[in-house]
Amino acid sequence: MREIISIHIGQAGIQVGNSCWELYCLEHGIQPDGMMPSDTTVGVAHDAFNTFFSETGAGKHVPRAVFVDLEPTVIDEVRTGTYRQLFHPEQLISGKEDAANNFARGHYTVGKEIVDLCLDRVRKLADNCTGLQGFLVFNAVGGGTGSGLGSLLLERLSVDYGKKSKLGFTIYPSPQVSTAVVEPYNSVLSTHSLLEHTDVAVLLDNEAIYDICRRSLDIERPTYTNLNRLISQIISSLTTSLRFDGAINVDITEFQTNLVPYPRIHFMLSSYAPVISAAKAYHEQLSVPEITNAVFEPASMMAKCDPRHGKYMACCLMYRGDVVPKDVNAAVGTIKTKRTVQFVDWCPTGFKCGINYQPPTVVPGGDLAKVQRAVCMISNNTAVAEVFSRIDHKFDLMYAKRAFVHWYVGEGMEEGEFSEAREDLAALEKDYEEVGAEGGDDEEDEGEDY
């Protein structure tokens, strides 16, 4: 089996995790108590969904996941919520005091005390796997736990499980909407370690997802639940081929191979289509070309970043539902002829497609309509640098005055770490610039042959 362990860190990671596991359970027909009436082979671990769930002898399905937070309130909601019987109590780890939006507390003082316990739980889950494939890590980099403890855990996972893939789903600070004053510090410090210790990081940002909810789902005032349900659809689409048998399966390591041209250039944009409310879905056909065009629209990007300002290096299109390869090839062919979707000149093919016949599932009473087919795109575009330059700019404004720095130094950080992390990000922006730059003069006429 190719198992995957999910690690949810901090409030954002846990709440996204709740939505994801709720959706997985619905997709597989697993009840909130972990029983699965449709599973005829009790205790036999050869079903495809066993990548994400382990089965007990009694036929109960337990998520291969760990939830960690430095303060108990959010995890207590899981402990008392609908799915309280689904998780093993040892998988829900909470501390006593929170990281107070401070990277240094999450990484050095408070986080240090809990990290060994987390790794111990992860080790137990890993020992339970026959062929561990990798980790999905969920966190936000604006707060203290997600950024600090998130980085610490990733660093330790690199040491303990060097060769295993680590995919991060990371919520980055939005341009306008801010939840903490020190977000720029936490994000820069945390990205510094994401660069080193994740293989693929998918950037999400709340503002972009708010706009999608408002525009496409007609929700006037979206809540975090609305946002998380949309995020969970993306994560579910990425992992369908690991959990169901499909026509063209995409493995977790395949994402890496196809999307990451250079180790540092691994920050992805994601988009999903159709995002549509039940009232509208009834009147639209939503064919393969339509949804394929939709995922390339700047407005459907899940991070505030305009792909037209950059060039694509690679895209991964994951279709699910009633889709045949012929339709996909035609749709991709159309996209290639579009002048708005530009690829770098050194990557002429640029598309990786996966198809899975399992149609998308929706949460009952949720906002999304039940549709026959959907597509999720993860793309590597040089425009992602916009996200970093925005945060770097805010970082510089604060750091020039050394504002709030004493809180970090007081928790045992050195000021040098700030400048080191900031220089690393400056280098990253430069990397993106170089990757997007045109090739030599002699290559100009070669770009047209595909």
From Swiss-Prot:
Coiled coil: none annotated. Its EC number is 3.6.5.-. The modification Phosphothreonine is found at residue 349. Residues 429-450 are annotated as: Disordered. It is an enzyme of class 3 (hydrolase). GO terms for cellular component: cytoplasm; microtubule. Keywords: Cytoplasm, Cytoskeleton, GTP-binding, Hydrolase, Magnesium, Metal-binding, Microtubule, Nucleotide-binding, Phosphoprotein. Residues 431-450 have a biased composition (Acidic residues). InterPro entries: Alpha_tubulin, Beta-tubulin_BS, Tub_FtsZ_C, Tubulin, Tubulin/FtsZ-like_C, Tubulin/FtsZ_2-layer-sand-dom, Tubulin/FtsZ_GTPase_sf, Tubulin_C. Signal peptide: none annotated. GO terms for molecular function: GTP binding; hydrolase activity; metal ion binding; structural constituent of cytoskeleton. GO terms for biological process: microtubule-based process. Belongs to the tubulin family. Tubulin is the major constituent of microtubules, a cylinder consisting of laterally associated linear protofilaments composed of alpha- and beta-tubulin heterodimers. Microtubules grow by the addition of GTP-tubulin dimers to the microtubule end, where a stabilizing cap forms. Below the cap, tubulin dimers are in GDP-bound state, owing to GTPase activity of alpha-tubulin. Dimer of alpha and beta chains. A typical microtubule is a hollow water-filled tube with an outer diameter of 25 nm and an inner diameter of 15 nM. Alpha-beta heterodimers associate head-to-tail to form protofilaments running lengthwise along the microtubule wall with the beta-tubulin subunit facing the microtubule plus end conferring a structural polarity. Microtubules usually have 13 protofilaments but different protofilament numbers can be found in some organisms and specialized cells. This is Tubulin alpha-5 chain. It comes from Arabidopsis thaliana.
